[in-house]
């Protein structure tokens, strides 16, 4: 028994060493989402119509092609944001750290769109380390394009400084989504194949410049509705204090998104979807859980959600009678209770309980795909391991 005990101890110590290395923690702040703002103002239905979105019958269609098409609704519910600094001296921006895309972009001083007037803008002339690249880029968001030019400068995230990082400077931002959003830009953490314009992503440069001890990062999203205290993105490893039990390592099936295989989706005791397997992505840049619209419509009916002012909601008094929804992944069950997948809000002094599921039509060849967004990640600590091309999941500690 003694050799076995020694072996187990060594494996435990190795795992802890790998986990902790030198961790660089990026605090994530939780703010009110754009959907909640629009709902409180009674403008949500108008928003759907102005963007030609049908959120009840089907939803937004997304024809993904190497990451140049991003579904608009992905960012409607975003609540967790961090800070990135660009240039010398630093110019600070609030960004979404998004595992579902691979570019860094922020508004440019040359942008004339209403969204840019409502947010900080990057001034290249004020940075002594800025380098002009000059290439143009374009990312499709829903019904409009975000366009701009690519520049290069030093980019800092909580003490990690990447030299010569190419990033997008937006000169045109579409629609109203970015006008009212809490974030200024997006920092993508997906694979290089998703990067628009062949730009090397920030995390790839962190690895290449030996800024992280281990080629991985991890995400913990607090369930605390008042500011999300403790939420963080960790570069260079993971923090075992944020989860219970051990990590279940799931192979990445396609390197672009952080894409994994689903073995099934169970509602209550019944496997309703993916009984023969399907594909999903773990995405910090999507707040809800999305899936093929017809499947999501069936799921909404199964949990008792009904259309209400352009979105699905349930009677808040029925939560204790609603079924659990379980995702079967790599032999492990990941169960969300109704309190996890129903999102409460207060509208005109009345309690509103919205569904955490949303239809999203991701067309071939990238789709169909399910997206496990923040509703899922809040309950399951997520580790993104580039060294072994795998995702680690474990129950998050509240």
From Swiss-Prot:
Post-translational modification as stated in the protein's UniProt record: Glycosylated. The nature of the carbohydrate chain varies between cell types. In brain microglia, the proenzyme contains a high mannose-type oligosaccharide, while the mature enzyme contains a complex-type oligosaccharide. In stomach and spleen, the mature enzyme contains a high mannose-type oligosaccharide. In erythrocyte membranes, the mature enzyme contains a complex-type oligosaccharide.
Main location: other
A Pfam family that the UniProt record links to this protein: A1_Propeptide
GO biological process assignments: antigen processing and presentation of exogenous peptide antigen via MHC class II; protein autoprocessing; proteolysis
Catalytic residue list: 98, 283
Location(s) in or outside the cell: Endosome
Reactions catalysed, as given in the entry: Similar to cathepsin D, but slightly broader specificity
Gene3D superfamilies: 6.10.140.60, Acid Proteases (2.40.70.10)
Keyword Manganese: no
GO molecular-function term, one example from the UniProt record: identical protein binding
Domain Peptidase A1: 80-394
Signal peptide: 1-21
Principal EC category: hydrolase
InterPro entries in UniProt: Aspartic_peptidase_A1 (IPR001461), Aspartic_peptidase_AS (IPR001969), Aspartic_peptidase_N (IPR012848), PEPTIDASE_A1 (IPR033121), Peptidase_aspartic_dom_sf (IPR021109)
Tissues in which the protein is found: Expressed abundantly in lymphocytes and macrophages of the thymus and spleen, and in the M cells of the intestine. In the brain, expression is limited to reactive microglial cells, the large pyrimidial neurons in the cerebral cortex, the CA1 and CA3 pyrimidial neurons of the hippocampus, the large neurons of the neostriatum, and the Purkinje neurons of the cerebellum.
Residues excised as propeptide: 22-58
Keywords carried by this UniProt record: Aspartyl protease, Autocatalytic cleavage, Disulfide bond, Endosome, Glycoprotein, Hydrolase, Protease, Signal, Zymogen
Keyword flag rRNA-binding: no
Sugar-bearing residue positions: 92
Protein's job: May have a role in immune function. Probably involved in the processing of antigenic peptides during MHC class II-mediated antigen presentation. May play a role in activation-induced lymphocyte depletion in the thymus, and in neuronal degeneration and glial cell activation in the brain.
Miscellaneous comment in the UniProt entry for this protein: Administration of dexamethasone results in the conversion of the proenzyme to the mature form in thymocytes.
Subunit structure as annotated in this protein's UniProt entry: Homodimer; disulfide-linked.
Family of this protein: Belongs to the peptidase A1 family.
Name under which the protein is recorded: Cathepsin E
Protein species of origin: Rattus norvegicus
């Amino acid at each position: 028994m003694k050799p076995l005990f020694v072996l187990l101890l060594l494996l435990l110590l190795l795992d802890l060493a790998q986990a902790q290395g030198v961790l660089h923690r990026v605090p994530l702040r939780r703010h009110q989402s754009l959907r909640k703002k629009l709902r409180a103002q009674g403008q949500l239905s108008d928003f759907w119509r102005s963007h030609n979105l049908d959120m009840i019958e089907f939803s937004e269609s997304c024809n993904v092609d190497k990451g140049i098409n991003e579904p608009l609704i992905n960012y409607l519910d975003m609540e967790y944001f961090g800070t990135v600094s660009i240039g010398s001296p630093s110019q600070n921006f609030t960004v979404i750290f998004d595992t579902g895309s691979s570019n860094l972009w922020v508004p440019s001083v040359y942008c004339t769109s209403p969204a840019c007037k409502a947010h900080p803008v990057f001034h290249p002339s004020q940075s002594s380390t800025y380098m002009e690249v000059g290439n143009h880029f374009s990312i499709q968001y829903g019904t409009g394009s975000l366009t701009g030019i690519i520049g290069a400068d030093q980019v800092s995230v909580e003490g990690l400084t990447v030299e010569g990082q190419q990033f997008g400077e937006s000169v045109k931002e579409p629609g109203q989504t970015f006008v009212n959003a809490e974030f200024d830009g997006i920092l993508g953490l997906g694979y290089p194949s998703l990067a628009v314009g062949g730009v090397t992503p920030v995390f790839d440069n962190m690895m290449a410049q030996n800024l992280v001890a281990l080629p991985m990062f991890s995400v913990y999203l607090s369930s605390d509705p008042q500011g999300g205290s403790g939420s963080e993105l960790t570069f260079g490893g993971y923090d075992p204090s944020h989860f219970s039990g051990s990590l279940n390592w799931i192979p990445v099936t396609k390197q672009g998104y952080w894409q994994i295989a689903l073995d099934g989706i169970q509602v209550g005791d019944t496997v309703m979807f993916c009984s023969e397997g399907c594909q999903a992505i773990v995405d910090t840049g999507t707040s809800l859980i999305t899936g093929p619209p017809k499947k999501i419509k069936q799921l909404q009916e199964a949990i008792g959600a009904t259309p209400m002012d352009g979105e699905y909601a349930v009677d808040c008094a029925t939560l204790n009678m609603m079924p659990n929804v379980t995702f079967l992944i790599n032999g492990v069950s990941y169960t969300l209770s109704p309190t996890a997948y129903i999102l409460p809000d207060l509208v005109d002094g009345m309690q509103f309980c919205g569904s955490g599921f949303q239809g999203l039509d991701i067309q071939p060849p990238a789709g169909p795909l399910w997206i496990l967004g923040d509703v899922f990640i809040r309950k399951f600590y997520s580790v993104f391991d580039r060294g072994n091309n795998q995702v680690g999941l474990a129950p998050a500690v509240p």
